[in-house]
């Protein structure tokens, strides 16, 4: 393991001991803000320190086993050979774990998100598939205890959505959904197809982290056009509806956002402004992210909206993620909310890219 990583681990171990003492201090315990902050840091540092302690113990075991390789007793030497092999395997595993634990954290991972799903090529079938994708993410959210609120929707003529925008709130939402942005393709026989021919349609998904108030982009009110309108429609589980809605146009960029979630215009405006800030921030950061991804020849993590990332083939019950050459024959389970089957391999690939960058 690199000396720089070992130095960082030593610093974290000292900090862990300091945090342990602080959390037992009466003055800290009486200050709830400090206590929460230190408790959060303790929870982040503790597993790293525990793994580091395990690594140092295995290193000591390895040194002891290597010393026994010189023993005069052939049985002891034979046993030592096996112990050395096991210790080296364990060391490699623990070093890999620690490297992953020390990877830079995405500051947006813990944020809520704005989820945008739009029908692309394929007409009515694309709109129906947009509805399928929204249900998939809603069911995934239910499994994780997240809350989904529709902000804006434009229903398709034969079901689904031409466009649906939702806010997803919960723990580590962006960290889980950030690689869902891109073009999702479906191959199936539409219900309206009398000849039984397979059609190909597509939808685009965008996942934008919700900025907090301190980090929200400052927007000049003179750059905005605000329209109000009345909205109605059928709601579903975890979805709030309203009679009043707001549409905000950011004139310099042409970005339009609308919200019909809350019953008060004031709340709708606040939510729409937060969404607008997220879109403007995404506009600024996506170009830089694409440049980095292109330079390092990455697909996972580029966030390119035009990139075809996944195909859902109903005839074969197959889901293929093209970025990591992942093919799963569990379409029904994934559409029922089992999206982790695709998300976890993507996160693993992203971490591998980060580790490779550290080694460059």
UniProtKB/Swiss-Prot annotation:
GO terms for cellular component: cytoplasm. The modification N5-methylglutamine is found at residue 237. It comes from Pseudomonas fluorescens (strain SBW25). Gene3D superfamilies: 3.30.160.20, 3.30.70.1660, 6.10.140.1950. Methylated by PrmC. Methylation increases the termination efficiency of RF1. It is found in: Cytoplasm. It comes from the Bacteria. The keyword Cytoplasm applies. Peptide chain release factor 1 directs the termination of translation in response to the peptide chain termination codons UAG and UAA. InterPro entries: PCRF (IPR005139), Pep_chain_release_fac_I (IPR000352), Pep_chain_release_fac_I_sf (IPR045853), Prokaryotic/Mito_RF (IPR050057), RF-1 (IPR004373). This is Peptide chain release factor 1.
């Amino acid at each position: 393991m690199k000396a720089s990583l070992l130095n960082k681990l030593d610093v974290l171990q000292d900090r862990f001991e300091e945090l342990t003492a602080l959390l037992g201090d009466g003055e800290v315990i009486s200050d709830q803000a400090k206590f929460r902050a230190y408790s959060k840091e303790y929870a982040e540092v503790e597993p790293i320190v525990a793994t580091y302690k395990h690594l140092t113990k295995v290193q000591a075991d390895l040194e002891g086993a290597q010393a026994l390789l010189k023993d005069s007793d052939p049985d002891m030497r034979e046993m030592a050979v096996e112990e050395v092999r096991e210790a080296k395997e364990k060391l490699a595993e623990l070093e890999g774990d620690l490297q992953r634990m020390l990877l830079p954290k995405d500051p947006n991972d813990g944020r809520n998100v704005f989820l945008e799903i739009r029908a692309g090529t394929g007409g009515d079938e694309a709109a129906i598939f947009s509805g399928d994708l929204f249900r998939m993410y809603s069911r995934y959210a239910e499994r994780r205890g997240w809350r989904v609120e529709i902000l804006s929707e434009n229903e398709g003529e034969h079901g689904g959505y031409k466009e649906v925008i939702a806010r997803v709130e919960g723990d580590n939402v962006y960290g889980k959904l950030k690689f869902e942005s891109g073009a999702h393709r479906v191959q199936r026989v539409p219900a309206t197809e009398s000849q039984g021919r397979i059609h190909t349609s597509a939808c685009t998904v965008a996942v934008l982290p919700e900025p907090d108030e301190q980090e929200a982009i400052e927007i000049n009110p003179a750059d905005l056009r605000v329209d109000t309108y009345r909205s109605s429609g059928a709601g579903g589980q975890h979805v709030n509806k309203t009679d009043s809605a707001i549409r905000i146009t950011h004139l310099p960029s042409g970005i339009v956002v609308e919200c019909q979630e809350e019953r008060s215009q004031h709340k709708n405006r606040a939510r729409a402004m937060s969404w607008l800030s997220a879109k403007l921030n995404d506009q600024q950061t996506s170009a830089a992210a694409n440049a980095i991804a292109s330079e390092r020849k990455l697909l996972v993590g580029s966030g390119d909206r035009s990139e075809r990332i996944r195909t859902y083939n109903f005839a074969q019950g197959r889901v293929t993620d093209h970025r990591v050459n992942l093919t799963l024959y569990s379409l029904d389970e994934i559409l029922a909310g089992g999206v982790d089957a695709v998300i976890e391999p993507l996160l693993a690939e992203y971490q591998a890219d980060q580790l490779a960058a550290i080694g460059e």
